[in-house]
Amino acid sequence: MSGERAKRFPLALEDLKRAPRKSEGRPGERQAAGAVPKAADKPAAVLKPVAVKPAAVRAPLPGIAAAKPATAPKPTAPKPALPKPAAPSIAPAGAFALTSERVRERMVERLRANGVTDARVLDAMAAVPRHLFVDPGLATQAYEDSALPIGHQQTISKPSVVARMIELAMAGRTLERVLEIGTGCGYQAAVLSHVARDVYSIERIKPLYERAKLNLRPLRVPNIRLHYGDGRVGLPSAAPFDAIVIAAAGLDVPQALLEQLAIGGRLVAPVGAQSGQHQVLTLVERVAHAQWRESRLDRVFFVPLKSGVI
C-alpha cells in the first residue's frame, strides 16, 4: 500500500463527517454515478391509494330487465355474400285483391255513368272478380269494357252488356230461379248468383263446362248449379224460371225456352244473324199461358247459339 493510501486508511472520525468526494472517472460515468445519490438523498413520495366508491346501481324499473354489460364482439370471419332470391312473378294475393277491388269500383262507376241504375246489379258487378275468369295473360284487361276470348271460339261478354242484360231480367224484382244459356267461363253466372236465389246454367262445350267449375270453385258459390247439355232445350226439370238469360245469338228464341218461362217472367237474348250483323238485344215477357210480348232494344254482337253438345 502506498504512503498516500496509508494515510487515508483507516479514516478518522472527523473524516467520516465530511462530504463524500465526487467519483473520478469519465464524464459519462460521473453523471451516471451522481444520479444515484440525488435519488437517494430525498426519498420518493409514496402515493396513497385513492378509495374508489362503487357506482350506485339503480334498481331496474318494474317490467324492464336490467341491461347486461356490453361485451366486445368476437371477430368472425366474413361470410360469402349469398345471391338474393328472384322476386316472384306473381303479385301476392292480398295486394292483387286490393288492386282488383279498386279497378272494379272504377268499372262500376263507368256502368253507372252509362245508365245502369239498379244498386243490386252494381253491387253484384263490384263483388265478382272478373280477372279470375279470363286467361292470366288477359287479366290486366279484365275490367275494361270489352269482350275477351276464352277459347273454343267463345268470349266473355263485356261488363256493360252483362249488367244491362241482368238489369233487364230483374226489372226491379227479387228473382227466385234464373236460367242461363251459355255458361262460358262462369262469370255471368257468378254475377247472377248475387241477385237470385238459385241460378241454373247450361254449357254445351265440355271443356268450358269444366273450366267454369274450376273458376267458380274458389268463390264457393252455393247457389249455382252447372249443367252440361244443349242450351236450346233448356232445363225442363227445374222450370219454370223467373228469368232466362241467353248468352248467344240465334235467329229466334227457341220455343222450348219460352215455355219454361214463368208467367210474368222475362227472357233476355240477342237475336239476329249468325254472322253477328244486325243482332239486337231482345226482351221477351210472358204475359199469359200462351202469350208473350217482345221488345227490341240495343245493337249487340254475340257468338252464335248452336244446338247439340261437343
Curated annotation (Swiss-Prot):
Gene3D superfamilies in the record? Vaccinia Virus protein VP39
EC number(s) given by UniProt: 2.1.1.77
Pfam families named in the record: PCMT (PF01135)
Reactions that this protein is recorded to catalyse: [protein]-L-isoaspartate + S-adenosyl-L-methionine = [protein]-L-isoaspartate alpha-methyl ester + S-adenosyl-L-homocysteine
Q: Which UniProt keywords apply?
A: Cytoplasm, Methyltransferase, S-adenosyl-L-methionine, Transferase
Its predominant location is cytoplasm
Q: Where in the cell is it found?
A: Cytoplasm
Query: What Gene Ontology molecular-function terms does this entry list?
Result: protein-L-isoaspartate (D-aspartate) O-methyltransferase activity
User: In what ranges is there compositional bias, type Low complexity?
Assistant: 32-44
Spans annotated as Disordered: 1-44, 67-88
Residue ranges with Pro residues bias: 75-86
Task: Specify the signal sequence span.
Answer: none
Identify the GO cellular component terms for this protein.
cytoplasm
Which residues of this protein are catalytic?
157
| Bias kind Basic and acidic residues: ranges | 14-29
Q: Which domain of life does the UniProt lineage start with? A: Bacteria
According to its UniProt entry, one GO biological process term is: methylation
Annotated HAMAP family = PIMT
Per the similarity annotation, which family is this?
Answer: Belongs to the methyltransferase superfamily. L-isoaspartyl/D-aspartyl protein methyltransferase family.
User: Which purpose does this protein serve, as stated in its record?
Assistant: Catalyzes the methyl esterification of L-isoaspartyl residues in peptides and proteins that result from spontaneous decomposition of normal L-aspartyl and L-asparaginyl residues. It plays a role in the repair and/or degradation of damaged proteins.
What's this protein's name?
A: Protein-L-isoaspartate O-methyltransferase
Per the UniProt record, the source organism is Burkholderia orbicola (strain MC0-3)
Give the encoding gene's name.
Answer: pcm
